[in-house]
Amino acid sequence: MRFSASLLLALTGSAAASPIRAEEEIRVYDLPISLFDDLQGLDAAMKAAGREYIGTSLTVRNDFQEQNIIRTEFGSITPENAQKWDATEPNRGQFTFGSADQHMDWARQNGKHVRCHTLVWYSQLPGWVSNSGFNNATLQQVMQNHINQVMGRYRGRCNHWDVVNEAPRLMAMRLQIGEAYIPIAFRMAAQADPSAKLYYNDYNLEYLGPKVEGAARIVRLVKQYGARIDGVGYQAHLVTEPTPTQSTPTPSEEDLIKALRITADLGVDVAYTEIDIRMRTPSNAQKLQQLADAYYRVARSCMKVPRCVGMTIWGVTDRYSWVPNTFRGEGDALLWDSNYQRKAAYNAFLRGIQEPVN
């Protein structure tokens, strides 16, 4: 079975602060950051609200400040690159787990939940897969072996797995296997680690329209094949303002909620999996306030959708963010600046988690 034209179109497109009286007419995230020093961290606030985790992507490096923030603020890590296909199986049948093991060991030593990432993705895919010319049967064998080896090594240690990432762009699988490669991958993953929650993960799902509807169709497709899919990851690589690479700013809280519900209403969990909200640089006070407002909207939308189980920020500090090297002239996308100082966006995000849901 091949991708239908309509599917392709769809896819390519708590210890809280003292109460603040209403008459004070101030927003929590306008307060000096020092006033928040004794508050619970982000993950503790999320758990106090009855959800699973607040996480960050992780690249293990010798940076005490970054690691200390992760230990105190985050309950979950996502290996940023260490579990991708090119890192784990650079040559057919030759597996290298050194970096992935390091990340998994760090998580275990520090008591962190792990979102393992990612099994089947068009990018960071070795040429021996993408340019192989394998037929349908061989490609399925390759996918089966890769999933079995990688998931099997970390069986029982991954809370969530991103099984398929950005499905419509994976031409190697699509051209030979057709759209069936998606449910096939989920079926293989469920057999390799029955305890892990299995996710489809994609970008631009936060905007109402063909992309999120395409993700919903993938959920239905996997279920129609009798395979298990537990959740949809909304990457949330967003912007505060129109930029050369993204014309539409972070949606309103209401539209974010609607977008999450499009897949959550199909009986799966949802999560924000790779949050960063970039702007044109350099930043200024107004832009940083827009950043705070956007992070607040994202947090509130998750808290207002019962099946939104967690949120992962794609990095801790702007010092190491992937954004400036990928989107020229854009950046300042995270909660801590390059000097490890919390931005107003941190307080806004925390407030978005802590505020009661009406």
From Swiss-Prot:
Q: What pH behaviour does activity show? A: Optimum pH is 7.0.
A biological process (GO) of this protein is: xylan catabolic process
Q: In which pathway does it act?
A: Glycan degradation; xylan degradation
User: Which coarse location class applies to the principal site listed for this UniProt protein?
Assistant: secreted
Q: Where in the cell is it found?
A: Secreted
Its cellular-component GO annotations read: extracellular region
Matching InterPro entries, A to Z?
GH10, GH10_dom, Glycoside_hydrolase_SF
Task: Report what the protein is called.
Answer: Endo-1,4-beta-xylanase B
